[in-house]
């Protein structure tokens, strides 16, 4: 059997982390068995259809590297095929037209609830051979579900699941406007596309027996089902693709790596011993539906940040640097005005969790800052440090060999001569060169900023203290 899986999102909102997991599991299963992965866009909900969501889905999957072998197929382009099957089912007696009005159905529901019964369609139109109605009378088409027996399927994650047919409604498979419903379209799509394994969220479990019965009525082969548990956000609520902000595009914009996100997502329900870090090739080799937990998962941004930092520090420098360029451009930082980006990345990558953070924290290497941080200036740019800065300016100006080692020795020697701590002079230089008190090794910062810019910023700080002294004297 040639394995064939599918990812079938609805373009009605953002592609969120739960959707990404479904896509990843389906993709990995197909790749593990050297099968095919199909992309299908379920766009028959015309009222909520959002073309930007389609763009987001396609971009997100490409960014993650989840390439598809067929598609994208659009349900909206297959309407004639669905109607053809519905017509065939009407003729064979496996479906029927239901003329009950919305009011009739609501009255029926109220009566059932008042009697303590489970609301369901009574089947009043199920066996009608004719009815006096005007030509344009509205109707829906319902699937004639078996009224006895049971539906049993072996879920690859949850084991055997059984539903009694008497508990299942006669499903509407075509709306009154002539548009087929989701639960019908998905069955015909899976049938026509020869899908062998359906991997999806547990919220689809109740749809499965209805879909199986439709397939049986068509004498079709039943695919293998695997329903993964829900993912909850950090507040303990179910993710909503129309409410949660962190959709796939936001992860990308915020500087997360696709490798980190995939590694994070695969562990939301799947495990392989105590291993935490998985390359894409390892995921494809090790992925097994039997290792997916039945329990729900909860997102942890702390864990995702940790993984992202790991990949920033362990993937090839040239690869990370190339990705970082996009974030530098977004921050409008001109790379021509400063040091080699890979050198800056080497210095900063262990201090930050995302590419966006690295880009934002690297600005002082490429452009002058307008003002010193006020609290930092109040603490360090003070009259008693005036001489220290003038001495540093004089000594740095004399340097003929510009190297990290030379700068480090100069700073240490000044500490000895001036009888000040290395911490004090380092913090002072951080404020002078970056505008605040946070930076990597100060000698490395000076080296990358360069001699000319270092002297200019030292002069700026000296003048700042000069003005402060004048104000005190006045």
Swiss-Prot record:
Monomer. Catalyzes the attachment of glutamate to tRNA(Glu) in a two-step reaction: glutamate is first activated by ATP to form Glu-AMP and then transferred to the acceptor end of tRNA(Glu). It holds the Pfam family Anticodon_2. One of its GO terms (cellular component) is cytosol. It catalyses: tRNA(Glu) + L-glutamate + ATP = L-glutamyl-tRNA(Glu) + AMP + diphosphate. The keyword Nucleotide-binding applies. Keywords: Aminoacyl-tRNA synthetase, ATP-binding, Cytoplasm, Ligase, Nucleotide-binding, Protein biosynthesis. Belongs to the class-I aminoacyl-tRNA synthetase family. Glutamate--tRNA ligase type 1 subfamily. InterPro entries: aa-tRNA-synth_I_cd-bd (IPR045462), aa-tRNA-synth_I_codon-bd_sub2 (IPR020751), aa_tRNA-synth_I_cd-bd_sf (IPR008925), Glu-tRNA-ligase_bac/mito (IPR004527), Glu/Gln-tRNA-synth (IPR000924), Glu/Gln-tRNA-synth_Ib_cat-dom (IPR020058), GluQ/Sye (IPR049940), GluRS_core (IPR033910). GO terms for molecular function: ATP binding; glutamate-tRNA ligase activity; tRNA binding; zinc ion binding. ATP binds at residue 241. It is found in: Cytoplasm. GO terms for biological process: glutamyl-tRNA aminoacylation. Its EC number is 6.1.1.17. The lineage of its organism: Bacteria, Pseudomonadati, Pseudomonadota, Gammaproteobacteria, Enterobacterales. It comes from the Bacteria. The keyword Amino-acid biosynthesis does not apply. A motif ('HIGH' region) lies at residues 9-19. A motif ('KMSKS' region) lies at residues 238-242. It is an enzyme of class 6 (ligase). This is Glutamate--tRNA ligase. NCBIfam families: gltX_bact. PANTHER family: GLUTAMATE--TRNA LIGASE, GLUTAMATE--TRNA LIGASE, MITOCHONDRIAL-RELATED.
